[in-house]
A protein has these predicted regions:
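Residue-level detector of short, conserved catalytic/binding motifs and their immediate flanks
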Residues: 26, 63, 81
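Non-catalytic, conserved peripheral segments adjacent to functional cores
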Residues: 1-54, 78, 87, 92-94
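Conserved metal-binding segment of the jelly-roll/cupin
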Residues: 56-72
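Ligand-binding loop in jelly-roll beta-barrel domains
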Residues: 68-84
Length: 97
């Protein structure tokens, strides 16, 4: 468990990368009740631009990325936003792709 700070971004935003965690899920619980943007794509060998989706959270709901889900780091809409992160790290395997 640790704290992640999602930075306020300038819009329009260009997303040039996605990441995934092939061996574990990852949960983000917002601490600041600020809206944030979630960008995801289904598990696959490589993310498909046609499958990318984005959602706006009202800041009162958390997000759980299942194992292998492609995602962009959370995007704060108004101000920098803190999240409690629950995940698992593997020392003998590459945990982020």
């Amino acid at each position: 468990m640790h704290i992640f700070v999602a930075k306020k971004r300038q819009f329009p935003l260009q997303i040039k990368m996605l990441e995934k965690h092939p061996f574990f899920s990852q949960t983000f619980i917002p601490k600041d009740n600020q809206p944030f943007l979630v960008v995801v794509a289904p598990p696959s060998d490589e993310p498909n631009i046609e499958d990318i989706r984005s959602f706006i959270s009202n800041g009162e709901q958390g997000v759980n990325y299942s194992r292998g889900v492609w995602h962009f780091p959370l995007i704060s809409v108004n101000d920098d936003t803190q999240f409690i992160v629950i995940d698992r790290k593997y020392e003998d395997r590459k945990s982020v792709v």
